[in-house]
From Swiss-Prot:
Record keyword Cytoplasm present: yes
Keywords: Cytoplasm, Lipopolysaccharide biosynthesis, Nucleotidyltransferase, Transferase
Pathway: Nucleotide-sugar biosynthesis; CMP-3-deoxy-D-manno-octulosonate biosynthesis; CMP-3-deoxy-D-manno-octulosonate from 3-deoxy-D-manno-octulosonate and CTP: step 1/1; Bacterial outer membrane biogenesis; lipopolysaccharide biosynthesis
Species this protein is from: Xylella fastidiosa (strain Temecula1 / ATCC 700964)
Free-text function comment from the UniProt entry: Activates KDO (a required 8-carbon sugar) for incorporation into bacterial lipopolysaccharide in Gram-negative bacteria.
Main localization category: cytoplasm
GO biological process, one term: CMP-keto-3-deoxy-D-manno-octulosonic acid biosynthetic process
Entry similarity comment: Belongs to the KdsB family.
EC number(s) per entry: 2.7.7.38
Domain of life: Bacteria
SS bonds (residue pairs): none
Family matches, as InterPro entries: Cytidylyl_trans, KdsB, Nucleotide-diphossugar_trans
One of the record's GO cellular component terms: cytosol
Protein name, UniProt field: 3-deoxy-manno-octulosonate cytidylyltransferase
The encoding gene: kdsB
Amino acid sequence: MPFVVAIPARFSASRLPGKPLRLLGGRPLIHRVAERALSTGAREVWVATDDVRIAEAVASLDGVHVAMTANTHLSGSDRLAECARIAGWDPEVCVVNLQGDEPFAPAAGIRAVAALLHHSNADMATLATTIDKSEDLFNPNIVKLVCNTHGEALYFSRAPIPWNRDTFATTREPTPLGPWLRHIGLYACNAGFLQRFTTMQPGTLEQIESLEQLRVLEAGHRIAVRITPEHFPPGIDTPEDLAKAEKALEDV
């Protein structure tokens, strides 16, 4: 199924300022993410940014387009809606939102989220993977989610969900067969839905959790979820994450 990849990138990340231009293996992080996108066979790859420094860094990459967007967007999806207008995509074009802090996202997983949207009746599609480490379950930078029996998201949270009332009263170790899932910050929706997203008001849940996908659920829309077999290392949110990613790159 044809799709495009769009990468929202802003310079003023609160936990890691200048994140897209931080070096990973001697190259800007945004370069590594964009090259992952190019490896998927996407019809087009775009970086949407409000910072000329990021735009100039991306300009040296063959096959990557840049959309200069407003600096007032509340979320990456809001930014990509403007990117879609700049690019002139038809409303039915499948847009994969690849976060700018996912330099190790496997190409197969990126293609899979586009396929999931195509084969589902949901308005949006995303990926998740299982959690088996307590430090991940209780880390607020790692987003958790719960799904219904139809493989659709019920809720996303920075808190450990579901909360095991009995087990967590005595230990913080998740059971090996527990239902805990880590959300992978990769979305697919069509360009028309991106425009609808911008008309939805951020709700209380989105504002409390600082999770844009909750705007979709609060507005009554559906998000299909695939439990992915591909390995997705956590994204880079902090200096510690960047150091871990550097080490992982050295170990390859």
